[in-house]
Structures are given as C-alpha cells and as structure tokens.
Amino acid sequence: VAPLAGGVYGGEPDDLSMRAAFPQLWELEGRHRSLLLGAMRARKGRGSREGGSLFFSFAEGLQALTRRMAEALGERVLRGTPVLGLEPVRGRWRLHTPKGALLAEAVVLAIPAPQAAGLLRPFLPEATALLKGIPHTPAATVSLAFPGALPVEGHGLLVAKGEGLRARGFTWTHRKWPGRVPEGFSLVRAYFSGEAARLSEEALIRLALEDLARLLPGLPRVHRAWAFRFPEGMPAYRVGHLDRVERLEMALVKAPGLFLAGNYLQGVGLPEVVRSGRRAAQRALAHLSLGEAHGASR
C-alpha cells in the first residue's frame, strides 16, 4: 500500500485515512478481512478482460476537453479572468474580477481548497478554517525524451520507500499513450512529491535522470527534458478527512447558492472529480429551480 499512497497522494499510509483515500481497499478489507484475499477474489470474479484499453484520454491531452467546452459555450466563458473576491448580496453572489463585477444566483467554486478558502474568508470563517485544514503536498513531474526504444514493459512503476530513489514513480508514456510520442523515441515521466518537489527544475531533471539510470543501466543520453512544479499539487486525505468534509458541507448551509467541487473532497482521480462536479452542478440547478418556484408563488 505504501507505494500506492506515495504515488497517488505523495504521503505515507500511516498518515492517510484509508476510508477516504482508498475506499475500494477499505471495502475489500472489510468484506474479506484481508486486502490480499479480497483482491484475489475480486480479480477472480471479474474474469479475463477482452479487448479494449485500461486507459482513455484525448489525442491532444485533457486540454482538448476544456478547450472544446469553452468553444461550445462561447461568450458565456470568461477565459483568463481570475475571481478576486466573492460576497453575498441579498440572496445572490457578487464576483469581483479585473473586468468588473458579476452578479450570480448560484456559484460553484471548482478551484483548489487554498484558493477557495481565500474567497470565503470574509464571510464564512468556519468553512475557511476547514478548507485550510486540508493539507496539500507539493508535487512535480519530469518528462524525459530518449532516442530509440527503452527496455521497459508495462506502463510504469511505483517506488517503494527504502529503495533509495527520490522519485515516487515513473510512467512509460510511449507505452501508455503511444500516439503522443514521435516514432523512434521513448518518453518517460517521473513523479516527485514532498520536499523533493520544491527543488529547481534543473535539480528535478538531474534527480529523475539519476533514478532512471539506476533502474535502467545503460540509459541513452536524454534528448529533451521538461519539469513542471505544483506547489500545492495534491490534497492529503488525513485521518478524519470524511468528517471534515461533512462539517464543511454543514458550514455551507449558511451560504445558500454556494457550492464546492474539486479533488480535495471525495477523491483525487478523474472519475471522482467528475462526480464532484456533477454533484455540485445538480445542487446548483436545484437551488435555481427552488428560487424560480419561490418567485412564481409570490
């Protein structure tokens, strides 16, 4: 479990809420009294997988989805327009931006917890404190392009603590997403978290190359390297996280028409984040419908 906890959350399993961070493992352990036994029975029940792929994305990356959504919505989307402030105004919400103020009947804050806390601080101190109490660990990725084919199998690996490597894991991108890599090249992505993720881009690239060289002796000279750092990249689901989320939802009752969505609530994976967004949208629509019904009854 430790490599999984480090690769996904950048932390140690002793610090995490298993029920919040890995609900499937929690369910397996509770049902079968053993993670190993539960995994074996679950695999046996699924049988063999026929055809298809374990992974799905867009040919141009996930940015293709947001770009297409913005194009479809047209002028209703204000791109490159940060929200500088938020305040309740007689049952509605005023959003302050560099382009002026906007008035809305409902607001969904689909932003990281630290930024959401900053917007809520003037009028929701309890929710602000709960959001600030969700720790975020720094994360970084390093992409390395090599000429030729590297001697790797599968789609990557997670690194166990004590192996002497600084990276938390590696993805063989040319095998996982073959359409994104030019023919004749291999592409590897390394993942870092914690203090290592705070290093400079040059230092991160050096560490990634050193770790990869230990795993793959005779590594060819890197053709190109990119490093990306995310100072508050990953929320950590510490023990008591689900209770914190429940208290956060109760605190938002004082702010009708305001809803939260994001990876710091009930899952960091894309499926969980999509569900979080849908849940917030459904609640916002229900709030708007209630307002319309109330107005019609006057």
Predicted regions, residues:
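Nucleotide-sugar-dependent glycosyltransferase donor-binding/catalytic pocket residues
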Residues: 58, 135, 266
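Active-site/ligand-binding neighborhood in enzyme catalytic cores
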Residues: 1-85
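Short, well-ordered alpha-helix to beta-strand connector turns
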Residues: 73, 104-105, 255
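Conserved flavin/dinucleotide-binding core of flavoenzymes
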Residues: 169-298
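Mid-domain catalytic core of redox enzymes
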Residues: 81-215, 249, 295
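Short, surface-exposed acidic
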Residues: 1, 128-132, 217-225
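A structural signal for the hydrophobic beta-strands that form the central parallel beta-sheet
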Residues: 77-79, 109, 260
